[in-house]
């Protein structure tokens, strides 16, 4: 693929995720948008690693680390969301004022 096409696709994914993260009122949707942002960044890592130096896999290895961290973040985030839902019966961000207590 052409470098510009992949970068434009990655920018679109990043902007869609950022827009969803800013406008989302649901915690699960916000976590999904955060994952979309991380996947766009991973796409950039792999693209630049492939474009600038084919012999080394630094971007690919860093991408694997980001995927592992994103999986841990998703597991912890969903555990927190399920705990909030059990206690408050809602996953809306604006109704959850946990830091005031």
Swiss-Prot record:
Topology of this chain in the membrane: Multi-pass membrane protein
Single GO cellular component term: chloroplast thylakoid membrane
Location relative to the cell: Plastid, Chloroplast thylakoid membrane
InterPro entries, sorted: NADH_UbQ_OxRdtase_chain4L/K, NUOK/Mnh_C1-like
Catalytic reaction(s) noted: a plastoquinone + NADH + (n+1) H(+)(in) = a plastoquinol + NAD(+) + n H(+)(out); a plastoquinone + NADPH + (n+1) H(+)(in) = a plastoquinol + NADP(+) + n H(+)(out)
Native organism: Arabis hirsuta
Lineage top rank: taxon: Eukaryota
The protein's name: NAD(P)H-quinone oxidoreductase subunit 4L, chloroplastic
Oligomer status and interactors: NDH is composed of at least 16 different subunits, 5 of which are encoded in the nucleus.
Function: NDH shuttles electrons from NAD(P)H:plastoquinone, via FMN and iron-sulfur (Fe-S) centers, to quinones in the photosynthetic chain and possibly in a chloroplast respiratory chain. The immediate electron acceptor for the enzyme in this species is believed to be plastoquinone. Couples the redox reaction to proton translocation, and thus conserves the redox energy in a proton gradient.
Ranges that cross the membrane: 2-22, 32-52, 61-81
Family: Belongs to the complex I subunit 4L family.
Keyword Transmembrane helix assigned: yes
Secretion signal, residue range per the UniProt entry: none
GO terms for biological process, alphabetical: ATP synthesis coupled electron transport; photosynthesis, light reaction
């Amino acid at each position: 693929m052409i470098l510009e096409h992949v970068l434009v696709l990655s920018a679109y994914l990043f902007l869609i995720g950022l827009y969803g993260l800013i406008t989302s009122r649901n915690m699960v949707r916000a976590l999904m948008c955060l994952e979309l942002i991380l996947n766009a960044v991973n796409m950039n890592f792999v693209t630049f690693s492939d474009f600038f130096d084919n012999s080394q896999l630094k971007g690919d290895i860093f991408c694997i680390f980001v995927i592992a961290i994103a999986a841990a973040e998703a597991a912890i985030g969903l555990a927190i969301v399920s705990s909030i839902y059990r206690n408050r019966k809602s996953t809306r961000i604006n109704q959850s004022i946990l830091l005031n207590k």
